[in-house]
């Protein structure tokens, strides 16, 4: 007689036992040699530093539903898992650990020793989120788990860089980037968090050159950068200042004559309608400077302190201290008109939690390949966006696409595969522009180091994390030196992608371009954009607000199925949802009803004896 089901449903025990049986029976293996129709999906690789949050739960539950449905439909299913090395996120964690335990910085221990520590940390902590995904019940083919720093995957990264460099699409140059003065690296837009902030709006005045008492009032939130001003600007349609355009005004300190220019970017309604132009420290100002051939004066060191160009009164001072000092100096000169409270949004480094600086820096850039093909694939529904309203967002970004800053001043990541001949390395690295045409014999770009490696020095920068993840759908399926593989032939292009709309540019668009460039076709056929989960008050969940429940606690209390059921019930694709524990309680109650129904049937006279399922049959 079959063992009687317990009176109360214990989801933890039942779910764990079933998952182990599925794994032991090989239920999740993708069979590239099978004759059934293929279904494939690649997991958006979570950060190796990560732990499960509700966004992960929703995203991976949707993927699991799609994969399990495909198996029920008789398809060979490959759900390919893996993790991302998460450059700055992982490096930051190890740097914090190093400071706490040894009182040292990464530069104190050196690059090689520091990277050894990162790998040690990764081996110790890197599998946590994978184990959590298994507890959630994800039916991935775990035997195929990949990591973006795997040796084979890393060779793919180098190959792609070499291909694009040789095609003239990768170059090095001086451009304005998001700069973190704490981590001392360029950041992607995705790594910058906009935060509302209570600031001050300073109205100051510059004297018109050649006059004794004609002044121009200028509004700014950043008086600490005025030492880098090389113009002031007005809107060409602003009649108040039409007679000023083309004249010169006098910058207070260091004293210099600078021109008044006209630019459509200037908002006549902001402040006085006149803005200072500091090309080295503002993206819009940089563009104005390029149009008007203005001098670029960088007044900051990389760490956010002021340099010699700021003058002796400010050199070495922190940027925020310099803001106060500059206002005081203007007031002493009689050129500070007023100071008002002002609320604005300021970009913060997501990891370092400090305000970023727009900064002109020597970086590596990529001109995107296959832009037209990618745009057409979405516009013509070769790739279906669900919901399709995201097509407009995608098209708008593709129309205004700009070159991608792919270099980062970090140590953890894929080091750029460029070597400089030692004898000329300093001159080569100081060049303001470098590409395949101008490289010459003193620069080597390759997958492997040059044969006489001791005569060369490697570029110290690493590649943006997204430069590895944009290859994820195909680089996980075969090696870079292979023409193809049975896995690629069977399962590529993948069927579906499930991701958040916040990375439609950073990941989705780039994967489509990479798919066309290296595989000649789209990387997936459908993209499902998930909801953003908010709390009951509609606020985004965060550790700071304390409104983000731990999914592991919820699974321990209610069961994984209850959590999955509750989230799926409230999460229509692409629409923000408000989370409440009551939804998970509903999931638990539903599971209890199913259990009690099975138990009731078991107790009836003449009930069929329950037997273990034979997965092999």
Language model features by range: what are they?
Residues 103-116, 307-316, 540, 547-552, ...:
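Short beta-alpha connecting loops at secondary-structure transitions
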Residues 243-246, 250, 312-323, 332:
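A glycine-biased structural micro-motif
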Residues 1-237, 261, 278-291, 295-310, ...:
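N-terminal, positively charged nucleic-acid-binding surface of large information/translation enzymes
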Residues 1-10, 376-389, 606, 610-613:
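Short, contiguous pre-domain boundary segments
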Residues 301-302, 368-388, 488-490:
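Residues forming anionic-ligand binding surfaces in small-molecule and nucleic-acid pockets
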Residues 47-81, 96-98, 180-182, 191-209, ...:
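Conserved active-site neighborhood of enzyme catalytic/cofactor-binding cores
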Residues 258-264:
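Short beta-strand-centered aromatic/proline hotspots
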Residues 202-206, 247-253:
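Short conserved beta-strand and strand-loop elements enriched in small hydrophobics
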């Amino acid at each position: 007689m079959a063992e009687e089901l317990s009176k109360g449903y214990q989801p933890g025990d039942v779910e764990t036992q079933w998952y182990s049986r599925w794994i032991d029976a090989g239920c999740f293996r993708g069979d590239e040699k099978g004759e059934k129709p293929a279904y494939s999906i690649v997991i958006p690789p979570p950060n190796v530093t990560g732990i499960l949050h509700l966004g992960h739960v929703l995203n991976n539950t949707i993927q699991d539903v799609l994969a399990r449905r495909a198996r029920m439909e008789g398809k060979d299913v490959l759900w390919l898992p893996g993790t991302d090395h998460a450059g700055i996120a992982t490096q930051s964690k190890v740097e914090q650990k190093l400071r706490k335990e040894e009182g040292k910085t990464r530069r104190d221990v050196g690059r090689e020793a520091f990277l050894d520590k990162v790998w040690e940390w990764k081996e110790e902590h890197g599998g946590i989120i994978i184990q959590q995904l298994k507890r959630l019940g994800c039916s991935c083919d775990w035997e195929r788990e990949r990591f973006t720093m795997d040796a084979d995957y890393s060779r793919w990264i180098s190959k792609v860089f070499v291909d694009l460099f040789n095609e003239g699409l990768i170059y090095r140059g001086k451009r304005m980037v998001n700069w973190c003065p704490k981590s001392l690296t360029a950041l992607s837009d995705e790594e910058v968090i906009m935060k509302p902030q209570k600031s001050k709006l300073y109205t100051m005045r510059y004297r018109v050159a050649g006059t004794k008492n004609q002044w121009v009032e200028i509004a700014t939130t950043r008086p600490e950068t005025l030492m880098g001003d090389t113009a002031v600007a007005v809107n060409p349609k602003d009649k108040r200042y039409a007679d000023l355009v083309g004249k010169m005004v006098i910058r207070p300190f260091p004293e210099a004559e600078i021109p008044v220019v006209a630019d459509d970017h200037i908002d006549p309604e902001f402040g006085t309608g006149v803005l200072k132009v500091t090309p080295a420290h503002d993206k819009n100002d940089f563009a104005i400077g390029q149009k008007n051939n203005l001098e670029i004066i960088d007044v900051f060191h990389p760490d956010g302190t002021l340099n010699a160009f700021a003058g002796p009164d400010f050199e070495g001072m922190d940027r925020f201290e310099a803001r106060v000092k500059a206002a005081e100096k203007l007031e002493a000169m009689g050129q500070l008109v007023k100071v008002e409270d002002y609320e604005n949004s300021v970009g913060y480094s997501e990891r370092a939690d400090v305000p970023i600086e727009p900064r002109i820096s020597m970086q590596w850039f990529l001109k995107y390949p296959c832009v037209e093909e990618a745009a057409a694939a979405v516009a013509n529904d070769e790739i279906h966006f669900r919901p399709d309203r995201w097509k407009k967002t995608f098209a708008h970004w593709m129309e205004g696409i700009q070159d991608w800053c792919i270099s980062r001043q970090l140590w953890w990541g894929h080091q750029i595969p460029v070597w400089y001949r030692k004898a000329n390395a300093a001159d080569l690295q100081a060049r303001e522009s470098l590409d395949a045409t101008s490289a010459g014999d003193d620069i080597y770009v390759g997958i492997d180091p040059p044969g006489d490696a001791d005569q060369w020095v490697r570029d110290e920068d690493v590649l943006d994390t997204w430069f590895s993840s944009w290859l994820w759908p195909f680089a996980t399926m075969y090696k870079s030196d292979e023409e193809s593989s049975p896995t690629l032939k069977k399962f590529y292009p993948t069927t579906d992608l499930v991701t958040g709309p916040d990375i439609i540019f950073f990941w989705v668009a780039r994967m489509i371009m990479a798919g066309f460039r290296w595989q000649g076709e789209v990387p997936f056929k459908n993209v499902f954009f998930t909801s953003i989960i908010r709390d009951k008050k509609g606020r985004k969940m965060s550790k700071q607000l304390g409104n983000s429940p731990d999914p592991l606690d919820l699974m321990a209390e209610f069961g994984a199925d209850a959590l999955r059921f509750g989230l799926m019930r409230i999460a229509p694709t692409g629409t923000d949802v408000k989370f409440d524990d009551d939804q998970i309680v509903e999931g638990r109650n539903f599971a209890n009803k199913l259990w009690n129904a099975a138990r009731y049937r078991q107790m009836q006279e003449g009930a069929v004896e329950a037997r273990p399922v034979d997965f092999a049959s």
